[in-house]
C-alpha cells in the first residue's frame, strides 16, 4: 500500500497543508510544535478512522474552526486506487467517504489501508496498563481478519449488556435467568476471540525471534498471552475452551453479582514480554524496552503483509529521539526495503532514497 497524496484543512495546527510522500522513505522535519505528527495522524485517520493519540475527534479540530477535512489518495500493491476523505464537525460528527461512498460503519473500512505506527506514547504497550497491550493485539488482528473485528464488536455489546444486568435492581430470578443467556452468548464469542489471539501470538513470537537478530544484544524475545483460562492456557480446542469459560463464570457468579461486573473474558486478558526469559517491564532498561517495541513493529509489518498480501504503510513519529542511531537506522533501512515509510524528526535526515519535506518551509511559503 502506498500513500500518493494527502490534503488536510483545519486539522490540529494546520490551516491547510498538502503532502505527497516518496515511494520509499520520506522524512517530515521541522521545529517542535510545527505539526509534523499531525500529518502522520491524518494518514492514520484515513487508514484506521481515528488518530493515534486519542479517540476524541474534537481534539483534532483547529482552535476556533468548525470543521476539519482530510482528503487522501492511496494505491495498493495491485495498482488499485483508493480515495479516502474524512470530515468532522461537532455539529455533524464524523463522516468518512471511500471512493466517494460514505461509510455506514467505520469498522467496515479497517484493513483497507493497512498501517503500522511507532510513536513515543506507544511505550505504554510495554510498561502501561493491560488495556494498552490488548489494544495492540486487537488493532493488529483487525487489520487482516474481519471476522475477528466482528466478533470483537459483538463481544463488547454482550459485555455491556451483561454488566448492565449485573448492576440492575431487577428481580433476582429474572437476573439469574437472563444472566445464563448472556453468559452463553459471551462464552461463544469469547472463545473465538481467545483462539485467534493465541494463534496470532504464537506465530508473531516466532517471527519476532527472526527480526530480533539484528538487535546488537542478540537476546531471545518471547511473548506470553495471559487469558482468563487460568492454568488451561494451552487449550486450542473450541469446545474445551468453552467448557472452561462456563466453569469459570459459574465459580465467579456470586462475586460478579456482588461487584456488579464481568470478571472473566478477553477484556481482562494481558500480554507479558520477555528477553532471555526475564520480564521486560521489570528487568529491562528503557533502551531495551524501546528496542523490543521497535522489533515488534517491524515484525507486525511483515505479519500484516503475510496475512493480507498488502504491505502496510509505516508511520514513525520522532523515531530518532527515541532510539540510538544504529537501531533507528537499521529499522528504517529494513522497513524501507518492504514498503513506504514516513518519518518525522526535528532535523533533516538525508540519504540514498530518502525524500524530505520541511513543514517549516511549507508554512512559510503559505504565509501571505
From Swiss-Prot:
Keyword Hydrolase: no
Alphabetized Pfam families for the sequence: AAA_23
Record keywords, A-Z: ATP-binding, Cytoplasm, DNA damage, DNA repair, DNA replication, DNA-binding, Nucleotide-binding, SOS response
Gene Ontology BP, a term: DNA replication
An MF annotation (GO) of this entry: ATP hydrolysis activity
Classification via InterPro entries: DNA-binding_RecF, DNA-binding_RecF_CS, P-loop_NTPase, Rad50/SbcC_AAA, RecF_2
Residues that, per the record, bind ATP: 30-37
DNA-binding is among the record's keywords: yes
Main location: cytoplasm
Subcellular location as annotated: Cytoplasm
Cellular component annotations (GO), alphabetically ordered: cytoplasm
Family as reported in the entry's similarity comment: Belongs to the RecF family.
HAMAP family found in the cross-reference section: RecF
Function per UniProt: The RecF protein is involved in DNA metabolism; it is required for DNA replication and normal SOS inducibility. RecF binds preferentially to single-stranded, linear DNA. It also seems to bind ATP.
Protein name: DNA replication and repair protein RecF
Origin species: Chlorobaculum parvum (strain DSM 263 / NCIMB 8327) (Chlorobium vibrioforme subsp. thiosulfatophilum)
